């Protein structure tokens, strides 16, 4: 049926599904599964009202990978209250997941407090916003005042990309090719 011709993807919250449900997703031809790794710090996850726990992140991605899905992680750093150690722990967790092979692709971004969100409201109330020029709310620069200098925050996010493009990653991607049509998609994934 159509479930073999239509490839599906979705966003997921770590810690919500068990192995049986990931297996069902794979049987329904889900492929790409995006997990937001907002932080490795439990205190930040609670503060931004994320129902997943840091300890659930690795297990969830391993189950998705075991089911044959292709986990993608969006790693975020740059909260106003985040310490250097907490930001580095989030980056380190992302690298560890990637090195273990439980995620296929990743993205590192600077947290942006979008209007209408509780984070934006808190930033405005506490004077943490650097600008309200909406053209700059594109994840390419820090918009909030943080403990980390802007240059260091930018270096953290850029550093994650240079650390993943290894021979092991390239081999893993080549071995995962299921059809010639995927080769073009793989090229788009690697070019960041």
Question: Residue locations for each model-derived region?
Answer:
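Aromatic/hydrophobic pocket-lining residues that form the small-molecule binding cavity
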Residues: 18, 57, 87-90, 153
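Short acidic/polar active-site loop segments enriched in Thr and Asp
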Residues: 31, 103-104
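Short, solvent-exposed turn/loop segments enriched in Gly/Ser/Thr/Pro and often Arg
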Residues: 13-14, 77-81, 108-119
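Catalytic cores of alpha/beta
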Residues: 20-23, 80-99
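Conserved, mostly hydrophobic/aromatic
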Residues: 25, 35, 94, 106, ...
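Conserved SAM/AdoMet-binding glycine-rich loop
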Residues: 1-72, 77-79
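A structural motif corresponding to the C-terminal end of an alpha-helix
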Residues: 28, 60-71, 97-101, 156, ...
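Radical SAM enzyme core and accessory elements
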Residues: 120, 128-192
């Amino acid at each position: 049926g159509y479930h073999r011709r239509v490839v599906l993807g979705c966003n997921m919250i770590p810690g919500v599904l068990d192995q049986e449900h990931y297996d069902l997703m794979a049987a329904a031809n889900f492929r790409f599964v995006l997990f937001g790794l907002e932080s490795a710090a439990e205190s930040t996850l609670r503060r931004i009202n994320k129902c997943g726990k840091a300890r659930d992140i690795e297990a969830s991605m391993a189950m998705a990978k075991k089911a044959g899905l292709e986990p993608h992680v969006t790693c975020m750093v740059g909260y106003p209250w985040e310490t250097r150690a907490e930001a580095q722990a989030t980056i380190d967790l992302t690298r560890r997941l990637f090195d273990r092979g439980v995620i296929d692709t990743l993205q590192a971004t600077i947290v942006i407090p979008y209007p209408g969100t509780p984070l934006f409201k808190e930033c405005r109330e506490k004077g943490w916003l650097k600008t309200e020029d909406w053209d700059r709310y594109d994840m390419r620069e820090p918009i909030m005042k943080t403990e980390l200098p802007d240059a260091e925050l930018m270096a953290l996010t850029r550093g994650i990309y240079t650390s993943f493009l290894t021979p092991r990653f390239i081999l893993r991607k080549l071995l995962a090719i299921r059809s010639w049509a995927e080769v073009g998609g793989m090229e788009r994934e690697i070019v960041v």
